[in-house]
């Protein structure tokens, strides 16, 4: 049980750092421009940031669950599809996805989930 919790916390921290770096440091201007083009303000209040933190740990929980039951590649694929592909479909459908970001977001998000799975696997198997 302690290893599961440690894996959850470590992979959740990694996912949170990765998401922050990608969306607040690297690509925030893309998001702001996309929302401005729609006549909207990009939501980045504290409550929005807290929800992204919660999302990061929900994804970490999914990763830990899958890593314990599947092979590493299967766990990465399932978690990535469940978290990112479904999110992109929804925000594309709402017309708020800056599709040009996918060129960068796809490989970075696969890397994010893969490293979270590796972190989880190493902690669980230690």
Predicted region positions:
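Juxtamembrane/disordered regions of integral membrane proteins
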Residues: 1-126
């Amino acid at each position: 049980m302690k290893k599961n919790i440690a894996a959850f916390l470590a992979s959740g921290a990694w996912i949170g750092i990765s998401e922050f770096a990608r969306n607040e440091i690297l690509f925030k201007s893309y998001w702001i421009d996309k929302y401005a083009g729609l006549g909207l303000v990009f939501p980045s209040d504290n409550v929005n940031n807290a929800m992204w933190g919660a999302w990061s740990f929900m994804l970490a929980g999914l990763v830990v669950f899958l890593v314990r039951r599947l092979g590493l590649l299967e766990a990465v694929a399932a978690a990535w599809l469940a978290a990112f592909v479904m999110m992109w479909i929804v925000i594309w459908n709402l017309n708020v996805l800056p599709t040009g970001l996918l060129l960068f977001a796809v490989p970075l998000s696969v890397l994010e989930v893969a490293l979270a799975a590796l972190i989880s696997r190493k902690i669980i198997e230690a």
